[in-house]
Every structure is written in structure tokens, then in C-alpha cells.
UniProtKB/Swiss-Prot annotation:
Residues 108-120, 255-274, 417-428, 450-475 have a biased composition (Polar residues). The keyword Coiled coil applies. One of its GO terms (cellular component) is cytosol. It comes from the Eukaryota. Pfam families: PH_3. Residues 57-121, 322-412, 487-645, 678-734 form a coiled coil. Residues 339-353, 525-542 have a biased composition (Basic and acidic residues). It comes from Dictyostelium discoideum. This is PH domain-containing protein DDB_G0275795. Keywords: Coiled coil.
């Protein structure tokens, strides 16, 4: 026994350990609990197979152990399932978080790139103001005053400020370059060169810098958009060269400039060549010569021939090495652009083939190809940027070479008369303006500009003078040329000085305005501080007055509390012992009915007890009847056995009458015994029948009594319900709809009185402590709720409130 009990104790201790491990709800503890349960299973099998454990004392312990084993195994399994589900949820959440983080990183990177691209060049201001615009029609192009206003990417110009209908506009995205000239600036586009003059020198910087900022901003926007249209196969043109057609025009123009002069045609071809410098009326110097081919005598009979003054174009063998290098570079640029166009065409064809394949390929391969296509525009952008940089470097080199040529040519200038030089320079400057337009517009002109003039025109005379200017070999006066350059430089220096003075004046005015603003801010801060001081002093005065009012109220409340305490004491002394006062007449009736209800409930309990006793007696009688029936059955069986034995013995005697005469006496005795047994059997049967009748009579009597008692109980219950209903109706008529409403009203009134008393006590104690210099921010209403929860007596409230303030 001791060994089995010890095993039971060990198993229970291990089960307690398993319970504690499962409660800890950690994976290591759950694994330990599972191992312990596995080790307990064979122990439980051994205990259940042991005979000592099958005893009634140990069976209950075994059942408890079995139930606990099942419970703990179920708990361990449930905890493991919960842990697995939590791990799965955590993994899913981690995956979702990783996906969200990746998406956020992608979005942040895109937003950063966009913000960086937008923050590199802030949005330029809107340009507006009056300018003088040069006309585009007629030989003498005059300047007219116009009001310019920028709207989005277009610069509209009106007759005056406030007009609604513009004369025209300049498309700013097509702007190639902005260059300053005398008292103005030039704005070059592929279709035209706009010349503007400024009223003030400050306006010059305003317009030039504003236009340059807009150009930078527009280029940055184009780069930030990542050439979305090019990714779809619509072309990869750079911002400077918008289409292949514009560059093809430039190619045709360059090829026509390289061809020799066609003498058979009757038109006059003006093709710019690298040659002698020409001084423009705006102060700029550009290189170039004009080539003329006059028609036959049938077209112009009165015109003189140009054989004496005409200089043929230099052949390729007589060209300077600088000109050869320039032409070679131009040819290289054209060749590169042609190769680029071929690459673009090949790429477009490849893109079309890829799109056809994508329609047949699965969606995964389509996604991969889309990613590759998205990566292609960035590579194309890099290639275009590199090509643009190369072109810019080549243009800079060309400009440097032109400047060197101009310096060389200025050192050996021809000499002519001052009148011819002036007249030629004025007329030749107009011709140079017409020649500069095809140079600045090589992308949209498919053939060089053609000018047809008569012999008597001043333009033709200026051209003759210019040819004489080149052929006679006359020299310009160096001193006049130097003086003109010095005058121009002095003018520029004066303009720069004026600009600097205006800039300094603006800065001084801005600084003075800022100083005034700071002084105003200081004055405002001083006034605000004074106002705050006045407000704080007024608030302090108001608070002092409020404290005095509170003190007066506290004194009044304390007096009222003292009076209330006295009244409460009087009421407590005069309060009767009974639950309700004697003034109400209905209280006696209520009490009497309550007594009746209590007495009837007691009577019902007594009747139920009597019924239980009678039920027990009936069960006892039934048991006795069953015992009697069993005895009668046994007696009947015994009698039947005896009868069977007596009949057998009679047959045996009849067969042996002849042999044994001495057995006659025995037979007679046996017959007498059978008769007695029959009589006794009949007596028993009659007795049994009588007993059965009595049992039936008793059962009917008990059943009748039970029915009577059940009827009595039902009647009493009905009477109780009626009396309770009448009682509640009576109380509702006197007190109200609810039976507890009167008591609830009294309790509410008591709570209101207690709350007012508690608030007055709290305010008085708080003000007293404030006077002494102890401040505490405590809500008195919350303290009242706490007092009611703790069931503190109202006489102990002052001490309790002071303790709460001390704790705070």
C-alpha cells in the first residue's frame, strides 16, 4: 500500500509541475511538460494494472490522475496549436511588413528622386514687364513697345498692360539660347531669333536670368519624367533636337554649303562660309563671306558685270587647316546623328517584335521584359546626355577657333575710304542678320536662304562695295577701330557700374526695410510683454478676489454644516425603532399581510414535510408487500414439490401391493400428510389474497390522500399569488410604480446631502492648506466616490480628507 501511495504522490507532483509549466506558456516549458506527460503514461499503465490500485480507496485517486492526465495533455496540445498559429501569423505579418517596407522604400526613393530633381532647380518666377520688340517684316525692322506676360510655357506679348488679346507668343520650351546685345538681348528659337531692347539695365538681368532659369527648370522636368513617351517606342530625341526632320534640314543645309557655286543658275546664293570677319551693328563679330552668281544679260541687261570684283570660293586644297577641322567635325556630327537615327529605327523595330512576342508569352516573361524596357530609357538618357556634352564641347571649340580667326583677320584689316566703310558696314550688318538666321536655324531650313536684288538696290551696292572691300586690299584705320572698341568697353564698364550701384542701392534699401521690420517687431514684443504683465496682474487680482469669495463661502458652508450636524443628531435621537413611522395607516395592514404570508409559507413547508413522511411510509408498505409476495411464491413452489413427491410415492405403492403388504400403513400416512398440506396451502392462499386486498386498499387510501394534499397545496399557492398581487397593487397605489421607489428616493436625498457636506469639507480643507502654503491638485468629486466605496463614516471624513491631501 505504501509503495502505491508513494507512486500516486509522485505522479500528482509531476502533474502539478506540468500544470505550472503549461501556465508559463513558453516553448521550452511546453516541451518539458510534453516529455513529463510521455514519461507518466507507462507509470499510469503500471498503476492501473496493479491489484492494490483497484481497491476502492485507490480507485478514486486513479480516476483523478486519469482526468488530470487527459486535461493536461489537452492543454499542452492546445497551447502548441496556439503557438503554431501565432508563429504562422507572425510570419505572415513579417512578410506583410517586409512587403510594405519594400513598397515604402520604393515610393520614398521615387519621391526623393522627384523631390531632388525638383529641389535642384526651384520653380522660376513668372516673367512680366515692358520690352521693345524688333519686327520680323521689312528691310528696316523697327522696335515697338510691347507688354510681355508669361503664362505656363508661353511668353505672350500685348500692345499694353491689361489687354486680353495678344499679338503673339514665344514658345519658351523651344528656346535654344539667350544672348545679351547692346541695350537688350536675343532669344533664339529653331524658327526665329527674337531681338528685344530694355528700358532699364536692371531689366536686362531680370529677363536674361529669368529665361535661363526657366530653361534649366524645363530641362530638369524633362529629365525627371524619365522619357516616358520614349519607353513606348515613340522616339528618343533629345530636348535640343526634337525630331529627325529638323536635323535633316540642318544636314541638307550643311551639304549645300559645301557644294561649289552653280554659275549656270540665275539666282543669288547666300551661303555662310568660314572667312573674313563681319562687324555687326550690335557689337558682335561673326565670320563668313557671301558668294554671288549673277544671271545672264537677258534677265538684267543694265546691270554691270561682277567679273572684276568677284572672288571665287576657295577650293578644298586652298582651305585653312582650321576650316578643314571644322568641316571634318561637322561631318562627324552628321555621321553620328545618322547612326543614332539608324539605332533608333532598329530599336523601334525590335520593340515591335518584342511586343508581338509578349502577346504570345506568359505574363511572367512579359513582366521581365517590361522591367528591361524600363531600364532602357535610363541608358538612352545617359547616351543622349553624353552626346549633348560632346556637341557642346565641339561648339565651344568651334567658337574658340572662330575667335582666333577673327583675331588673325583683325590684325590684317583692309583699307577703304571712311564713307565706303560706313556705308558698307551699315548695309552689310543687315545682310549679316539675314545670314545669321540660317546659321541659328539649321534644323528647319532645307535649303540656304536666297536673296534676289536688282542692280540699282542699295543692298546690291553694299555687296559690290563689300567685294571691293575684300579685293582691293585696303586697310581700316586701326586707331578708329581701337577707339570704337574702347568706347564700347567704356560703355560696358559704365553699364556694369550702374548695375552695381543699383544693386547696392537695392541691397541697402532691403537692409533698411529689414531693420525697420525688426524694430517694429521689437516694439510689438515690448507691447505684448507689457500687455501680458498687465493681464497677469489683473488675473492675480481676480484670483485673490475669488479666494476671498471662496473663504466667505466656506465660512457660510461650515456654519450650515454645523447646523446640519445638529439637525442630524436631533433626527437620530428622535428616530423610532420601527422601519416605518406610525403616521402612515397602511403600514399596519402591510405588516399584518406580511405575517399572514409568512405563516402560510410555514404551513406549506409543514405540509410538504408530512407528504414526504407519508411517501416514505408508502414505500415501506410496498417493500413489505414485495417481501410477502416473495414468501408466498416460495411456499407455492415448496407445496408443488411436495405434491409431486406424494403422487410419485402413490404410484410406486400401487405397483407393489401384491409383494409388500406391510407398506399399506405408510401410504395411509402419506395421504393424510398430503391432505394437511393441501389444507395449509389453501389457508396460505386465502391469507395471501387477504393481504393483497389490504395492500390494494392501503395504496388507494394513500393515493387518495396524496391527491387531496396536492389539491390543498395548489389552492394555497393560488391564495399566496393572489395575496402577493394584492399586496403589490396596494403598495404601488400608495408608494409608486416600483416597490423600492420610496426607499430609493430617500437614499438619493441622503447621498445628495452627504455629497454637499463632503464638498464643503474638501473645499474648506483645501483653502486652509493654501493659506498655509501647501498646494495640491485633487478632484473632490473623485474623493467622494472613493469615500463611498471604502464605506467611511461621515464623522471620520475630515481626518480621511486631510490624510488624502497629505499623501498627494
Amino acid at each position: 500500500m505504501s509503495s502505491v501511495r508513494a507512486q500516486f504522490a509522485e505522479v500528482q507532483e509531476q502533474l502539478n509541475q506540468v500544470h505550472s509549466l503549461v501556465d508559463s506558456n513558453t516553448p521550452s516549458d511546453l516541451n518539458k511538460a510534453a516529455t513529463i506527460l510521455k514519461s507518466l503514461l507507462p507509470v499510469y499503465k503500471d498503476l492501473s494494472g496493479n491489484e492494490e490500485s483497484k481497491r476502492p480507496e485507490n480507485l478514486e485517486i486513479l480516476k483523478e490522475i486519469k482526468s488530470r492526465l487527459t486535461e493536461e495533455t489537452q492543454r499542452v496540445m492546445s497551447k502548441k496549436e496556439e503557438a503554431k498559429s501565432l508563429q504562422i501569423q507572425q510570419q505572415q505579418q513579417q512578410q506583410q511588413l517586409l512587403q510594405q517596407q519594400q513598397q515604402q522604400q520604393i515610393l520614398e526613393s521615387t519621391t526623393r528622386n522627384r523631390q531632388a530633381s525638383q529641389q535642384e532647380l526651384p520653380k522660376p518666377p513668372i516673367l512680366s514687364g515692358y520690352l521693345k520688340k524688333q519686327g520680323d517684316k521689312g528691310l528696316v525692322r523697327s522696335f515697338k513697345k510691347r507688354w510681355f506676360l508669361q503664362r505656363d510655357t508661353k511668353l505672350f506679348y500685348y500692345e499694353k498692360e491689361g489687354d486680353s488679346e495678344p499679338y503673339g507668343f514665344v514658345n519658351l520650351p523651344e528656346m535654344i539660347n539667350v544672348k545679351t546685345v547692346d541695350s537688350g538681348f536675343e532669344l533664339a528659337t529653331p524658327s526665329r531669333v527674337y531681338v528685344f531692347q530694355v528700358f532699364k539695365p536692371s531689366d536686362l538681368t531680370y529677363w536674361t536670368e529669368g529665361l535661363k532659369e526657366f530653361k534649366k527648370y524645363y530641362q530638369s522636368l524633362q529629365n525627371s519624367q524619365k522619357f516616358g513617351a520614349n519607353a513606348n517606342g515613340n522616339g528618343n530625341s533629345s530636348p535640343n533636337m526634337s525630331s529627325s526632320g529638323s536635323y535633316s534640314d540642318f544636314r541638307k543645309y550643311s551639304e549645300s554649303s559645301q557644294q561649289p557655286l552653280n554659275s549656270s543658275t540665275g539666282a543669288i546664293n547666300t551661303t555662310p562660309q568660314r572667312g573674313t570677319p563681319i562687324k555687326d551693328r550690335r557689337g558682335t563679330v561673326s565670320g563668313g563671306t557671301t558668294e554671288y552668281s549673277h544671271s545672264s544679260s537677258s534677265t538684267a541687261p543694265d546691270s554691270p558685270t561682277l567679273s572684276s570684283s568677284y572672288v571665287p570660293p576657295p577650293s578644298s586644297s586652298n582651305l585653312n587647316p582650321q576650316d578643314e577641322e571644322l568641316k571634318r567635325r561637322e561631318n562627324e556630327i552628321i555621321r553620328k546623328h545618322q547612326e543614332k537615327l539608324k539605332q533608333q529605327d532598329d530599336q523601334q523595330q525590335d520593340d515591335k517584335q518584342q511586343q508581338q512576342q509578349q502577346s504570345q508569352e506568359p505574363p511572367q516573361q512579359q513582366q521581365q521584359q517590361q522591367e528591361q524596357l524600363q531600364s532602357q530609357p535610363s541608358q538612352q538618357q545617359q547616351q543622349q546626355q553624353q552626346q549633348q556634352q560632346q556637341q557642346q564641347q565641339q561648339q565651344q571649340q568651334q567658337q574658340q577657333q572662330q575667335q582666333q580667326q577673327q583675331q588673325q583677320q583683325q590684325q590684317q584689316p583692309p583699307q577703304t575710304s571712311p564713307q565706303n566703310s560706313r556705308h558698307g558696314s551699315t548695309n552689310y550688318s543687315q545682310l549679316q542678320q539675314q545670314q545669321q538666321q540660317p546659321q541659328q536655324q539649321p534644323q528647319q531650313q532645307s535649303s540656304p536662304q536666297v536673296i534676289i536684288s536688282n542692280n540699282n538696290s542699295p543692298r546690291f551696292e553694299s555687296q559690290q562695295q563689300q567685294n571691293n572691300f575684300h579685293n582691293n586690299g585696303s586697310n581700316i584705320n586701326l586707331e578708329s577701330f581701337r577707339q570704337s572698341i574702347e568706347d564700347e568697353l567704356n560703355k560696358k564698364f559704365l553699364k556694369e557700374k550702374q548695375d552695381l550701384m543699383e544693386f547696392e542701392i537695392k541691397k541697402r534699401l532691403e537692409i533698411e526695410s529689414e531693420i525697420k521690420k525688426l524694430q517694429l517687431q521689437l516694439d510689438q514684443t515690448k507691447t505684448d510683454a507689457e500687455e501680458k504683465q498687465n493681464k497677469s496682474s489683473n488675473e492675480l487680482k481676480k484670483k485673490k478676489a475669488e479666494i476671498e469669495d471662496y473663504e466667505a463661502r466656506v465660512t457660510i458652508i461650515t456654519k450650515r454644516n454645523e447646523e446640519m450636524d445638529a439637525k442630524i443628531k436631533e433626527l437620530e435621537s428622535s428616530r423610532p425603532v420601527e422601519t416605518f413611522p406610525h403616521e402612515f395607516l397602511w403600514t399596519e395592514e402591510v405588516n399584518s399581510r406580511d405575517l399572514l404570508i409568512a405563516s402560510q409559507s410555514k404551513r406549506i413547508l409543514e405540509l410538504e414535510e408530512q407528504l414526504k413522511l407519508k411517501d416514505n411510509a408508502v414505500t415501506v408498505i410496498k417493500r413489505e408487500n414485495e417481501m410477502l409476495r416473495q414468501e408466498t411464491e416460495k411456499k407455492d413452489k415448496y407445496i408443488n414439490e411436495l405434491l409431486e413427491k406424494g403422487g410419485g410415492s402413490g404410484i410406486h405403492t400401487n405397483s407393489n401391493n401384491n409383494n409388500n403388504s406391510n407398506n399399506n400403513n405408510n401410504n395411509s400416512n402419506n395421504n393424510s400428510n398430503t391432505d394437511k398440506i393441501k389444507e395449509s396451502m389453501v389457508a396460505h392462499q386465502t391469507q395471501n389474497a387477504f393481504l393483497l386486498q389490504e395492500i390494494q386498499r392501503l395504496e388507494t387510501q394513500s393515493q387518495f390522500k396524496l391527491d387531496i394534499k396536492i389539491q390543498q397545496i395548489e389552492e394555497l399557492e393560488n391564495q399566496l399569488e393572489q395575496q402577493l398581487y394584492q399586496f403589490h397593487r396596494f403598495r404601488e397605489a400608495i408608494i409608486g410604480t416600483m416597490s423600492n421607489e420610496y426607499c430609493v428616493k430617500i437614499e438619493k436625498e441622503n447621498l445628495d446631502v452627504k455629497k454637499e457636506y463632503f464638498q464643503s469639507l474638501g473645499v474648506s480643507i483645501k483653502l486652509h492648506r493654501v493659506k498655509e502654503g501647501y498646494f495640491a491638485n485633487i478632484d473632490i468629486n473623485s474623493l467622494f466616490d472613493k469615500v463611498i466605496k471604502e464605506n467611511v463614516h461621515y464623522r471620520n471624513w475630515p481626518e480621511w480628507i486631510s490624510n488624502q491631501f497629505n499623501q498627494a
